[in-house]
């Protein structure tokens, strides 16, 4: 809104130059040529506002031109317009952050590069058949039929968009988040990019899982790295997350030979997923309709700072099943740590979009 307001204020210089209105706030004379520059500056700021609303990543380039032109006009009319420098300075900060975010070293561009090098034209995937799922427990077979996986192409990858909320720690306030992720299943990989802000300061994060190695990075203002977690606890935890995503968002991938199944009762199965030398176990709970309604694992580790890790039970209760181009998935989930002090629900996710078997980056 500051950008829009600043843009509209520049119309005053244009109006005074062409005598469209009496501007008592502007005591210095403004030529018609200068008035045209005030108009151009106004248009630039309004364009920046619209580009930002439309989530066009190049908005900051137009903003640089607008700020430079605006500040030159302010200097020429310093006595009347000097306070515009404050607004230009306020707009400059997010421009700098956006510029840093456009550098190859930004988490957003690392995420994009990692995904792009794994996307390629793929052969036509065969449809999932009843024969493919006959080795699965009856409950899992019912789940795959319920989700519409049978008769559709097997899943090699997917792209997912979330909106939701997260907490840093127990008792903290919820933060609004937006995220995007790509998962790959021919060669296991998961890339999860998240954006949010705290006290008005933007930050972003990247979970990267390739092979069986995981890292988590968080940067403030795309510049200051505050978390860089890695190690065996991260590797184990993100193996759980990769399998959780498979169960929730890519049921067709549950025919994977690296999963061992055990029917516990009519609505519960135990699954052990192995990726090279890492094995994790989870309990999957279903309802009578065939929906997966909870995923519970004891193999995930909690950390507030990416340095100290604690092993707690982790669960993701699920609901809100909806159809996406013939595939039905849960669109609402929570992530809960079961700590000695009690349950800590630290994330709530709403699925906004999901696509399967992509060949190009979106």
How does the language model describe each region?
Residues 217-275:
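Flexible, processing/modification-adjacent segments and terminal tails
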Residues 154-161, 185-193, 215, 263-272, ...:
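Short, hydrophobic/aromatic-rich segments at coil-to-beta transitions
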Residues 270-356:
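Gly/Pro-enriched, hydrophobic low-complexity segments
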